[in-house]
Regions:
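Flexible, glycine-rich beta-alpha linker
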Residues: 81-83, 148-177
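Rossmann-fold scaffold of SDR-type NAD(P)-dependent oxidoreductases
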Residues: 23-35, 52, 70-78, 159-160
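Glycine-rich NAD(P)-binding loop of the Rossmann-fold in SDR/ketoreductase-type enzymes
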Residues: 5, 47-55, 131
Length: 231
């Protein structure tokens, strides 16, 4: 078990894999610290961000250099990872970021606002999952901007994944999941996406929807294999 909220653990694990195997072929970052509607965001935000956001950037930071030719480095996020899920006044917080450190700082500014009780007045969503997912997608986009040419020349795909609505204990308290698939039903299309050859370079660095076609939250349907708009 790897505790991604402890960044030294992520670094040690990456070093161990490099020493034993010389590199990695597939990394799926799919960790999630759940929250319940009755939780006080100010009380849970620190661990939530450490695991879901700083843990994600730590994985990207330490595993991207280890990817072998044809590798896949994918972050399981959500269609809520689009800036369109945020109030327009907040979009600039996640635009024009140049490094993973910039992403961490942007996320921590939001975290501090939640911790101090200022988030509602700054029109941040009440559900902390939304800014967190946007931070994950922003991290992938920033790293992709740095690695695109080199990665594509080696057949490496770096992207974030929207698996669609899934009936899980983490989502059930927040969403109407009537008819939503179970996790094992979603695993197959995700693995198909991971294992198939990279034939569409436009997916690199993007948030790619691989689940069922769903009514989009942005006024359009989201189809399997399509890119969820960033803004």
């Amino acid at each position: 078990m790897l505790d991604v909220s402890k960044r030294n653990c992520v670094a040690r694990f990456a070093d161990e894999l490099a020493a034993r195997h010389g590199g990695v072929d597939i990394v799926l970052s799919n960790h999630y610290a759940r929250v319940e509607p009755e939780d006080d965001p100010a009380e849970v935000i620190d661990h939530y961000v450490e695991a879901n956001n700083l843990g994600t950037t730590s994985i990207l930071r330490h595993f991207a250099p280890l990817m072998r030719d044809g590798g896949r480095l994918l972050v399981i996020a959500s269609r809520a990872g689009s800036l369109r899920a945020l109030a327009p006044a907040l979009h600039s917080r996640f635009q024009n970021l140049r490094s993973l450190e910039d992403v961490d700082r942007a996320v921590c500014v939001w975290r501090d606002a939640v911790r101090a009780g200022r988030a509602p007045g700054q029109v941040w969503p009440a559900w902390i999952n939304i800014p967190s997912k946007i931070g994950q997608v922003a991290a992938v986009r920033v790293l992709a901007g740095q690695r695109r040419v080199a990665d594509l020349s080696r057949g490496i795909l770096l992207a974030s994944i929207s698996p669609g609505l899934i009936d899980t204990g983490a989502s059930r308290p927040w969403l109407d999941l009537a008819g939503a698939p179970q996790p094992d039903e979603v695993a197959a299309p995700v693995l198909d996406f991971v294992l198939r050859p990279l034939t569409d370079e436009s997916l690199y660095g993007e948030l790619v929807h691989v689940g069922r076609e769903e009514p989009g939250p942005f006024g359009m349907p989201i189809r399997a294999g399509s890119v969820v708009p960033w803004q």
